[in-house]
Amino acid sequence: MWKRSDHQPKIKAEDGPLVGQFEVLGSVPEPAMPHPLELSEFESFPVFQDIRLHIREVGAQLVKKVNAVFQLDITKNGKTILRWTIDLKNGSGDMYPGPARLPADTVFTIPESVFMELVLGKMNPQKAFLAGKFKVSGKVLLSWKLERVFKDWAKF
């Protein structure tokens, strides 16, 4: 059997901090970040800008029809290169670069080339999804409402 002991180890204090048995060595420099590419260098950037203008013009109508927040993660060679959010749930609608400010209802992870084919109408979204060309997480059924937004924009 184990015997309870009241033995407390004694540590001889030396110069320097000994709190919690670690020593703060100083700040670690941040790793150098690669220089970010300009947004305009991406093939899909003009399309996003155009859709953004369209949403600003007819956003209030789209908010009534769609009522969802979508996040588009555009990839190239398996890495996310662009992230855009289409907010058709709040206010009169908005589209902005970056992650969703509020939790997104649906998140799309799409290679840039597939995204371009989808928005230009060269590829059927349902067939592309079923073929595994892009991934959807969250409320998958809302993705069909985004298809309506892209078709609306194409007519514009």
From Swiss-Prot:
InterPro entries with a match to the protein in the record: SCP2_sterol-bd_dom, SCP2_sterol-bd_dom_sf
Coiled-coil annotated spans: none
Domain SCP2 residues, every copy: 44-156
Pfam families with a match to the protein in the record: SCP2 (PF02036)
A cellular component term, taken from the record's GO annotations: cytosol
Superkingdom of this protein's organism: Eukaryota
Record-linked PANTHER family: SCP2 STEROL-BINDING DOMAIN-CONTAINING PROTEIN 1, STEROL CARRIER PROTEIN 2 SCP-2 FAMILY PROTEIN
Protein name: SCP2 sterol-binding domain-containing protein 1
Source species of the chain: Homo sapiens
Gene: SCP2D1
